Design a protein with these regions (language model features):
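Terminal and domain-boundary accessory regions
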Residues: 1-188
Length: 188
């Protein structure tokens, strides 16, 4: 059984806040490798700037994840009318709001690319935008396990997957402990 792991970092950050604990990415890799050949592991993250979360991203890479990033979109707090004309002041810059970086396309491209040499996908996300991707992967014969948190996963996505695992049920296996940065597997 060949397995691929895909982690929507934005979705999982909020899911972990909801359950009240954070998982250790290394423990997740180890769990995903049990009973299967873990052929790829992807982590998707939005960034405020290119240096944002650099140590964390480096640690993920050292563990064996392929890390994909996109900049967060920034919106002005005043509706953007002045900033659209090039006028800005300190009040506006203090009211900046960052919104989600949409990495759904990257997730889809990666999973469709590895699909021909994969039997199973573990997807950690709650995004409704991925439901059609999951349907297509299942139509290609892949088994899809969705891991997320009750109340933070779109019904359409959950219904599209073969199996749903509530993140809270994995706490004994995944909860963050002491940092370890040895690779769990080698990317091929």
């Amino acid at each position: 059984m060949r397995r691929v792991l895909a982690v929507d970092g934005h979705s999982m950050f909020y899911a972990q806040q909801k359950v009240g604990w954070f998982f250790e990415p290394r423990n997740l890799l180890e769990l995903a490798a049990e009973g299967a050949e873990l052929s790829s592991a992807f982590w998707y993250a939005g960034l405020k700037d290119p240096s944002d979360q650099r140590p964390f991203r480096d640690a993920l890479t050292n563990l064996g994840y392929t890390v994909r990033t996109r900049p967060l979109r920034e919106l002005g707090g005043s509706g953007g009318s002045d900033s659209a004309r090039g006028h800005s002041d300190q009040r506006q810059s203090d009211q900046r709001q960052y919104v989600r970086a949409n990495l759904d396309v990257e997730i889809a491209i990666d999973l469709l690319t590895v699909a021909p040499r994969t039997d199973q996908v573990w997807l950690l996300s709650g995004s409704r935008d991925l439901d059609r991707l999951v349907e297509v992967l299942r139509a290609q014969g892949l088994q899809i396990t969705l891991i997320s948190t009750e109340g933070m996963v779109a019904r359409e996505l959950r219904n599209a997957a073969d199996r749903f695992i509530d993140l809270a049920s994995l706490r004994p296996r995944l909860e963050k402990g002491e940092a370890q940065q040895q690779p769990v597997f080698s990317r091929t």
